[in-house]
């Protein structure tokens, strides 16, 4: 698979301004506020000018039950802090209570997280973007009928199911400090998804992710687990990540990538015990990007929230091939980043318990497993099911410019004019002003229109010919 450096990618980004309002409860380490901090930081770095920003739709219960059980989703829809006493048995059954508390707006929070990931997958499927980013997603512990590890709905599994409608093989990569157990479990018996997790192992949540857990049935050898010890640093992580992922890409040959960028693997995380810097963490994003595959980037863990915001802002810049200064711009949460007010963090002096011998031994065992794979398994593709999120981009172009658009339509629009507008003395910054662009389109000369009409007729004829050819090839393939 050809690698290439520095090719500019089209990036889209999903964010809803309400996501930072959800609150797991006093003393709970999971703070959705970190997503708002990330968003505010990347706005003040000016990164919004270089990507398309979308508000995610709220995923429906029907979308969620493409993976989760009906009764579990019905329970999540129904339970509230004021009616918990009526659901005590179900709370126990669905593991909701301590780690996964009931809080105000719980189901809406799940809808936004899932909506961004599923919509990202649809965008990638339609080749409308190269990279899609949803920092509200990445909730990798949720099971089919159970909440786990602060996660309720597994947006990753739902996004991968969407990608599988168009892609024969999808690779899932997890660099959160915790094992990506919910995603591995969902695809444990299939050869169409390979899950690769680099995580702390041994008396650590969730307790899964042993080197010997390799998948089952058709999925045997399609689960890859790299168990790690405390204190891994940038150098050691890069020394294992690059060769393992190179071998995975060579043997599995996926056509799409989902990268879970949990930031609890950073040095100084409140719940973590690794020693990665933001640059070391982001090297994984940089490397996966060189494979030039459609990529979905998701959030995940991360409990020292100032560092989560730093990390995901920097990784957004990496996705955009954009250099940003180490000096943090003034932003709404500036005081959180003291005393240094810098983007990058230093590693601590903790001991790296991952010796070179240990890492090499695990790596060689994984290579042996990967050699057991058939090169790029063949998959018989079925008719493509309907997309979970309907693409309404065509409707916008047909709107009457003199008519006021509906609230629903404006919500689907890229960004929000007030929040992302440039000041008058700023340059274009690579952003398209949709209204002006349409205005210019309307003032095309008649000659240009005629020329385009002729061109359209030719293209239509060409498309018909190609369609006939492809139909004939399909029929021949069927008969074989």
Curated annotation (Swiss-Prot):
One of its GO terms (molecular function) is protein lysine deacetylase activity. Residues 417-427 have a biased composition (Acidic residues). Residues 10-321 are annotated as: Histone deacetylase. The keyword Nucleus applies. Keywords: Chromatin regulator, Cytoplasm, Hydrolase, Nucleus, Repressor, Transcription, Transcription regulation. Gene3D superfamilies: Histone deacetylase domain. Residues 401-416, 443-480 have a biased composition (Basic and acidic residues). Its EC number is 3.5.1.98, 3.5.1.-. Residues 387-480 are annotated as: Disordered. It is found in: Nucleus; Cytoplasm. One of its GO terms (biological process) is heterochromatin formation. It catalyses: N(6)-acetyl-L-lysyl-[histone] + H2O = L-lysyl-[histone] + acetate; N(6)-acetyl-L-lysyl-[protein] + H2O = L-lysyl-[protein] + acetate; N(6)-(2E)-butenoyl-L-lysyl-[protein] + H2O = (2E)-2-butenoate + L-lysyl-[protein]. InterPro entries: HDAC_PDAC, His_deacetylse, His_deacetylse_1, His_deacetylse_dom, His_deacetylse_dom_sf, Ureohydrolase_dom_sf. Pfam families: Hist_deacetyl (PF00850). SUPFAM superfamilies: Arginase/deacetylase (SSF52768). Histone deacetylase that catalyzes the deacetylation of lysine residues on the N-terminal part of the core histones (H2A, H2B, H3 and H4). Histone deacetylation gives a tag for epigenetic repression and plays an important role in transcriptional regulation, cell cycle progression and developmental events. Histone deacetylases act via the formation of large multiprotein complexes. Also functions as a deacetylase for non-histone proteins. Found in a large complex with RBBP4 and MI-2. PANTHER family: HISTONE DEACETYLASE 1, HISTONE DEACETYLASE HDAC1-RELATED. This is Probable histone deacetylase 1-B. It comes from Xenopus laevis (African clawed frog).
């Amino acid at each position: 698979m050809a690698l290439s450096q520095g090719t500019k990618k089209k990036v889209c980004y999903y964010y809803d301004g309400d996501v930072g309002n959800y609150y797991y409860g006093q003393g709970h380490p999971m703070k959705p506020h970190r997503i708002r901090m990330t968003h505010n930081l990347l706005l003040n770095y000016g990164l919004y000018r270089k990507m398309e920003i979308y508000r995610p739709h709220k995923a429906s219960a029907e979308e969620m039950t493409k993976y989760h059980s009906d009764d579990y989703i019905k329970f999540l829809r129904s339970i509230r802090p004021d009616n918990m006493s009526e659901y005590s048995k179900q709370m126990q059954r669905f593991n909701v209570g301590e780690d996964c508390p009931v809080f105000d707006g719980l189901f809406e929070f799940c809808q936004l997280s899932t909506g961004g990931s599923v919509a990202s997958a649809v965008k990638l499927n339609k080749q409308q973007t190269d990279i899609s980013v949803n920092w509200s997603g990445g909730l990798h512990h949720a099971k089919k009928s159970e909440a786990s590890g602060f996660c309720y709905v597994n947006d990753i599994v739902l996004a991968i199911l969407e990608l599988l409608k168009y892609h024969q093989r999808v690779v899932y990569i997890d660099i959160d400090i915790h094992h990506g157990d919910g995603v591995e479990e969902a695809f444990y018996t299939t050869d169409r998804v390979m899950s690769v997790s680099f995580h702390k192992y041994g008396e650590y949540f969730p307790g899964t992710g042993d080197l010997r857990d390799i998948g089952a049935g058709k999925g045997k050898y399609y689960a890859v687990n790299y168990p790690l010890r405390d204190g891994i640093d940038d150098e050691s992580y890069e020394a294992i990540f690059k060769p393992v992922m190179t071998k995975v890409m060579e043997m599995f040959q996926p056509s799409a990538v989902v990268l879970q960028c949990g930031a609890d693997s950073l040095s100084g995380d409140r719940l973590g015990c690794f020693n990665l810097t933001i640059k070391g963490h982001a090297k994984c994003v940089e490397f996966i990007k060189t494979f030039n595959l459609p990529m979905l980037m998701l959030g995940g863990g991360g409990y020292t929230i100032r560092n989560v915001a730093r990390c995901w802002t920097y990784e957004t810049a990496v996705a955009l091939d954009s250099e940003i200064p180490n000096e943090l711009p003034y932003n709404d949460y500036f005081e959180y980043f003291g005393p240094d007010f810098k983007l990058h963090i230093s590693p601590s002096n903790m001991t790296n318990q991952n010796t070179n011998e240990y890492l090499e031994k695990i790596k060689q065992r994984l290579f042996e497993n990967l050699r057991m794979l058939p090169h790029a398994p063949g998959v018989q593709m079925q008719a493509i099911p309907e997309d979970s999120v309907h693409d309404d981009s065509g409707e916008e172009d047909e709107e009457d410019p003199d008519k006021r658009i509906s609230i629903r339509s404006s919500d689907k629009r890229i960004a929000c004019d007030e929040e992302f507008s440039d000041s008058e003395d700023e340059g274009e910054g690579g952003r398209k002003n949709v209204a002006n662009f349409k205005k210019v389109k309307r003032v095309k000369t008649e000659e240009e229109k005629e020329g385009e009409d002729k061109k359209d007729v030719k293209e239509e004829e060409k498309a018909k010919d190609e369609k006939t050819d492809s139909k004939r090839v399909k029929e021949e393939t069927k008969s074989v």
